[in-house]
Amino acid sequence: MLSRVVLSAAAAAAPSLKNAALLGPGVLQATRIFHTGQPSLAPVPPLPEHGGKVRFGLIPEEFFQFLYPKTGVTGPYVLGTGLILYLLSKEIYVITPETFSAISTIGFLVYIVKKYGASVGEFADKLNEQKIAQLEEVKQASIKQIQDAIDMEKSQQALVQKRHYLFDVQRNNIAMALEVTYRERLHRVYREVKNRLDYHISVQNMMRQKEQEHMINWVEKRVVQSISAQQEKETIAKCIADLKLLSKKAQAQPVM
């Protein structure tokens, strides 16, 4: 629990530590020293989310697991007790009033940790989850933005790959425009030629009609000129006789 609190406090204080006057040059110098090479492209192993197990709030579990095959289950405790007694018997460590103060302080801290550690840990975990959620949201937004950029780039590449279709369409449009112009000119020529042929046909028909009229008038005039007065009288008399005969036949027929 204390490790989570320390990590959270360190993360919150990191920007201020970078700008600190005393630690800034040292940190920058260390950065210059340890980050002069090329970055490694090897995959970075994921950091553990939770710390390892400890006993008595201080001694790691790996220490006991290391001594179990050699000393048995009680070996680490016997070793610790013997080490404490050795330090006291040889007066390497002398018990003073400060020792009782330290024991009281440690006991009070242990009590605080046992009583409020879980709630403080949950609060720290909640803060970390909120920060992780914010970072995840920023990450997803960045991923979406990058994906949109990738999709746009793919669409642009697809348009570039299909630009020959555009050239083909333009080429076909130009060919169609040329074909339409050619057809229009051809139709204009056809209309002009037809008009001229119609004119010549009209002229020929008119000349033929005039020739026929002139021939008829000439023949009629010659026929009239060739008839004598005696022939005219005989023809008129014959016509009158024919009319009288026709009238008599009409009167002789019974009325139905």
UniProtKB/Swiss-Prot annotation:
InterPro entries named in the record: ATP_synth_Bsub_B/MI25 (IPR008688), ATP_synth_F0_suB (IPR013837)
Keyword Oxidoreductase included in the entry's annotation: no
Transit peptide: 1-42
Cellular component GO terms held in the UniProt record: mitochondrial inner membrane; mitochondrion; proton-transporting ATP synthase complex
PANTHER family: ATP SYNTHASE F(0) COMPLEX SUBUNIT B1, MITOCHONDRIAL, MITOCHONDRIAL ATP SYNTHASE B CHAIN
Complex and partners: Component of the ATP synthase complex composed at least of ATP5F1A/subunit alpha, ATP5F1B/subunit beta, ATP5MC1/subunit c (homooctomer), MT-ATP6/subunit a, MT-ATP8/subunit 8, ATP5ME/subunit e, ATP5MF/subunit f, ATP5MG/subunit g, ATP5MK/subunit k, ATP5MJ/subunit j, ATP5F1C/subunit gamma, ATP5F1D/subunit delta, ATP5F1E/subunit epsilon, ATP5PF/subunit F6, ATP5PB/subunit b, ATP5PD/subunit d, ATP5PO/subunit OSCP.
Known function: Subunit b, of the mitochondrial membrane ATP synthase complex (F(1)F(0) ATP synthase or Complex V) that produces ATP from ADP in the presence of a proton gradient across the membrane which is generated by electron transport complexes of the respiratory chain. ATP synthase complex consist of a soluble F(1) head domain - the catalytic core - and a membrane F(1) domain - the membrane proton channel. These two domains are linked by a central stalk rotating inside the F(1) region and a stationary peripheral stalk.
Name of the featured protein: ATP synthase peripheral stalk subunit b, mitochondrial
Source organism: Bos taurus (Bovine)
Organism taxonomic ancestry: Eukaryota, Metazoa, Chordata, Craniata, Vertebrata
Gene name in the database record: ATP5PB
